[in-house]
Amino acid sequence: CGCNGPLTISQVRMKLRDYAGENDAWGAIEFSDAEIVNAMTLPINHFNGTTPLGVTFDACTWPQIWQSRWLDATVAQLMLTAAYNYMRNARNIQTAGGVTEDRNQRWKAYMSLSQGVWQEFQLWAKATKATMNWNGGFGTLGGTSPLY
């Protein structure tokens, strides 16, 4: 890209600790590269579609100062994807020792985490776009740097 430096798959995996050795439940990565790339596009698309419309970004032009928000929102989308999968496949399994277990019951925790982080991103996007719109209409205060 040569611009601000987009998120990388490695950064997302590191935030999630999504490595085969770390996922003791199944010994494999949880998210494919394609799922991660798709999840990376969703926060930017949401930001661009948030009113007031006008300023838009892509993976290359997303401001570096907002990188952590993009990363958190990407993780939220991956957690939502996983929550839907776990919810769809949830079932109780009786083990030989008589213990009922279902690793897919984690969907509730994934869903809750995802919704909280995504809602925070949505509120931030709305406030940031409003500030950008205000600055675009009235300029900046005390210098040449925008207030966002």
Question: What do the predicted segments below correspond to?
Answer:
Residues N45, S68-Y84:
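Short, hydrophobic/amphipathic alpha-helical patches that form generic packing surfaces
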Residues A39, W70, A109-Y110:
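A structural signal for short hydrophobic/aromatic patches embedded in well-ordered alpha helices
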Residues P52, M79-N92:
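Short, solvent-exposed secondary-structure capping/transition elements
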